[in-house]
Regions:
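Cofactor-binding catalytic cores of oxidoreductases
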Residues: 1-97
Length: 97
């Protein structure tokens, strides 16, 4: 288990730097120990910086979830960062790539 915390008084830029460091160093190290990228991750909420969120958060279910989303939301009206099909949207969720 890896833990990253910060004081509430820390600036937003410093918090972002801590999150980036965790995503770039601790998470890959833990994935290597746990048997690879399909081992999963949990940071109290989906880490917006997670580079492989499809596998990390959804695992083998991602393809099936894409099909379900295509039925109920064919125009991708409902999107969230690091959610199903969010990789086709810009970082602000305003425009498709």
């Amino acid at each position: 288990m890896a833990i990253q915390y910060w004081e509430d008084s820390l600036s937003a830029a410093d918090v972002q730097a801590l999150r980036k460091n965790f995503t770039a160093t601790a998470r890959p190290a833990l994935a290597g120990l746990a048997g690879g990228e399909s081992s999963g991750s949990y940071l109290n909420e989906g880490d917006l910086l997670e580079p492989n969120f499809q596998v990390t958060f959804f695992g083998p279910n991602y393809a099936r979830l894409e099909k379900i989303k295509a039925v109920y939301d064919p125009k991708d009206l409902f999107i969230v960062p690091v959610g199903v099909r969010s990789e086709f949207w810009d970082a602000e969720g305003m425009c498709t790539k």
